[in-house]
């Protein structure tokens, strides 16, 4: 009898204990589910906070610089001022003073007012605009680009039917890469423009022509027909092959024409992904076609939550590069002495910058950045010619860009030029830059 009682008691206790455990497990599961919901809500709140921070930053920028804040149809903020004026004159500009120290050079240090720019625009109506950029390089004009230059960078008429479609004609910026159109110094963190966008994409690059542009919530685009490139005998810089072929608006030979276009896709969190191209015949001074150039450039740009990340690639092929080489060179040179024009150019750069002051209650910005570039201006050359030394290079660039005001940037950086077949270079740079 006692055994039955004990067994029954144990069974009742076990059942009660099991029920108690089940209840505790159920309670724990409910607590876990509740915590998971709270975590999801916190994550969502954090994302919303980041969005609000970014919107607040943009609002502060609009308050600080309402006129120059909005870039328009591929142009930089200062170059877009005419589009904010309903009627009458608009004036903007930018400038940059550079300090360059290269211990291997003589002299090792220079200070140069590299560029002083005036934007002059006129709004005939809300739809019909004139816009221009006039540039002085190296503070004065003496003769020859290295001694100073006075130049028109662009000058065109623009008729905007709607934000989605407009017509543009005149001397136009070629819409390839990022910096050629948007080149005001405070808009990028490095002291100078990226090497790739100087030596393969020949910034600043303008040609005469006509075309269309537009901007929607999802995409923006530009497509122009312009004068083609021209090769003529004279000084040819192998480190930047396309620069000599630009015509830049002055009495441009146009027997061969060029097409250039660009498309950008606008993705969430202020991410832009796109590509651009330039396809052109290369003509001599008499208009005779020597060959063709095909340039393609993919790009990515992400500006969000303090980050400024950019990627630009460039790939160019040239048909009949030997004909272009001979046209550019003196009549007395041969394959061993001619400065060869490439059959193929290629490269890319990646920039990562972060504003460390975004965590503080300030309108000022302090970007720390790193840039890696890898390119070859002569990835392939005509048969029998040798690649020029220094064509294949890696660039390592680190520095800071302090913006006490959105329109002003004080910069300092270090550049390592790492060449495959010649002595490397270490360069220390600083700059005072502004736009308005």
From Swiss-Prot:
Superkingdom of the organism of origin: Bacteria
Signal peptide: 1-18
Keyword Signal appears in the UniProt entry: yes
Protein keywords: Signal
Name of this protein: Uncharacterized protein aq_1259
């Amino acid at each position: 009898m006692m055994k039955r009682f004990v067994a029954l008691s144990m069974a009742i206790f076990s059942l009660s204990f099991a029920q108690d455990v089940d209840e505790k497990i159920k309670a724990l599961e409910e607590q876990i589910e509740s915590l998971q919901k709270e975590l999801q809500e916190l994550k969502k709140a954090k994302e919303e906070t980041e969005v609000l921070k970014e919107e607040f930053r943009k609002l502060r920028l609009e308050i600080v610089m309402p006129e120059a804040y909005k870039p328009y149809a591929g142009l930089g903020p200062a170059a877009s001022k005419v589009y904010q004026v309903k009627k009458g004159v608009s004036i903007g500009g930018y400038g940059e003073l550079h300090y360059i120290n290269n211990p291997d050079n003589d002299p090792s240090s220079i200070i140069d007012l590299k560029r002083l720019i005036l934007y002059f625009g006129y709004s005939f109506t809300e739809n019909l605009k004139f816009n221009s950029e006039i540039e002085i390089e190296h503070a004065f004009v003496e003769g020859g680009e290295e001694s100073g230059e006075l130049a028109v960078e662009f000058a065109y008429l623009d008729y905007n039917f709607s934000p989605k479609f407009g017509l543009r004609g005149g001397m136009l910026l070629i819409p390839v890469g990022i910096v050629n159109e948007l080149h005001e110094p405070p808009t990028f963190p490095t002291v100078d423009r990226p090497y790739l966008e100087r030596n393969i994409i020949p910034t600043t690059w303008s040609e005469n022509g006509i075309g269309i542009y537009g901007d929607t919530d999802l995409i923006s685009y530009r497509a122009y027909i312009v004068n083609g490139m021209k090769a003529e005998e004279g000084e040819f810089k192998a480190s930047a092959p396309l620069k000599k072929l630009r015509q830049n608006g002055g009495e441009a030979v146009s027997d061969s024409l060029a097409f250039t276009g660009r498309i950008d896709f606008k993705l969430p969190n202020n991410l832009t992904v796109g590509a651009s191209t330039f396809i052109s015949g290369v003509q001599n001074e008499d208009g005779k076609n020597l060959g063709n150039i095909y340039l393609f450039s993919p790009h990515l740009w992400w500006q969000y939550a303090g980050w400024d990340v950019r990627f630009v690639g460039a790939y160019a092929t040239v048909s009949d590069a030997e004909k272009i080489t001979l046209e550019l060179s003196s009549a007395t040179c041969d394959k061993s002495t001619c400065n060869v024009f490439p059959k193929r150019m290629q490269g890319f750069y990646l920039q990562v910058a972060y504003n460390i002051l975004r965590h503080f209650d300030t309108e000022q910005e302090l970007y720390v950045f790193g840039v890696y570039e890898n390119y070859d201006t002569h990835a392939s050359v005509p048969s029998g010619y040798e690649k020029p030394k220094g064509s294949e290079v890696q660039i390592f660039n680190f520095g800071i860009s302090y913006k006490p005001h959105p329109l002003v940037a004080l910069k300092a950086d270090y550049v390592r030029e790492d060449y495959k077949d010649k002595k490397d270079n270490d360069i220390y740079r600083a700059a005072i830059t502004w736009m308005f």
